[in-house]
Amino acid sequence: MAEDFVIEMLHITKEFPGIKANDDITLQLRKGEVHALLGENGAGKSTLMSVLFGLYQPEAGQIRKNGKEVAIRNPNDANALGIGMVHQHFKLVECFSVLDNIILGVEPNKMGFLQKAEARKKVMALSEKYGLRVDPDALVSDISVGMQQRVEILKMLYRDNEILIFDEPTAVLTPQEIDELMEIMRGFKKEGKSILFITHKLNEIMAVADRCTVLRKGKYMGTVDIKDTTKEELSRMMVGRDVQLQVEKQPAKPGAVVLDVQNVTMHNDQRKKDSVKDVTFQVHAGEIVCLAGIEGNGQTEFVYGLTGLEKLTNGKITLDGKDITHATIRQRSKDGMSHIPEDRHKHGLVLDYSLENNMVLQRYWQPEFQKGGFIRSDKVREYSDRLIAQYDVRSGQGSSTIVRSMSGGNQQKAIIARELDRDPKLLIAVQPTRGLDVGAIEYIHKQIVAERDKGTAVLLVSLELDEVMNLSDRILVMYEGEVVGEFDPKTTTVQELGLYMAGARKQGKETK
């Protein structure tokens, strides 16, 4: 019956130019349940929740609360109905304090005067009640990502929201913070609050959700009770085929040193401190070494230094015995370095170029693609067509497709095809599966393992601990710009890695 559901989204359709993001989707949320929303990258999950939160208006369909139709024209309407949302990218004012962010827009006042003491009292009471420890006077710019998420949750609770939407809430958290968030969700459930939980992490769904609705390509695939399903069944519903969730690989057979990093330091002039501090390690042929850590701990800057995007302050980098510390990006590429960048749009592709032109960005100057100083379009097309077929890159018009119009997964496949086809000595893969669905992740993992097995040295930089544990032969943890530990994935645990990632431990000592 309708009254069993606190929220019903019935036959929702939402269109954008050229795409139907939500196509006749129905979702029903019970009071006091954790309801997961699962789907591939681009399946329409965030769009559907943005409709519920009033950020988008649907072309068709209706929303009911407790059986009565409601109009949600904007987020203020949603808040008035008790609906709150923690976005994947937090909506906080960095130069404001924690307290000011929580009460922003609903500041208590008396005769026009701000009642900050009253607000502080309510915030601290909520913080204590739900175990969401925060410093109300700290600037948001000075607190950790995990703390920022607590601030976002307290924003919802301060507004007395009873329907809580979490959009990919664990993407930037340590394992310990993820466990803490799961406990907080269970506490909300006991109180009778209802939670909608957008995620692509099957382990988290199995751990905390009561039911799960699956979307595929904007369409409703079904809703299942978690107690009656498996991870394999959920992944099959999500991508339409069986997916191998574990990476199959043989033990590594490391060869000679390919990458030798010695005492690398990089200074951040804006923050007036070192972003990378005296980093030293080696990567051998035929092994995958992973640099793990929470986002913002120097991994990005280190990769920029390694690939030539930024200069080192100090240190030395050797590639296959050759000093490349001061080499140009092109020279590093010629010397055998391939790079799958963290931001495929910023550093991986020229979005308004065709797919074929993107495929030769690293080699258009080579003789096979030139004649008399002019690029041979026929050879570029021939080369691109081969890579598209070999790496199963799907696009509307093949090699002539403008890259901007392709899905994230196929854009990533295009970069991987280009970088691997060069037979590199060293592959640097930075968050290669970020934002991708399980089908694309499975494919990319197989390609990386195959590259290792060919004898390539692989440096993987990842925030996903499942990926780190599955792919790595050795793990290095980076915290605040320095390597604080080296681990064997066969003998360590996610929990142990999490302590080092959070700065609670450093090999040789424990911090307080």
Each language-model region and where it sits:
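Glycine-rich phosphate-binding loops of nucleotide-dependent enzymes
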Residues: A2-K512
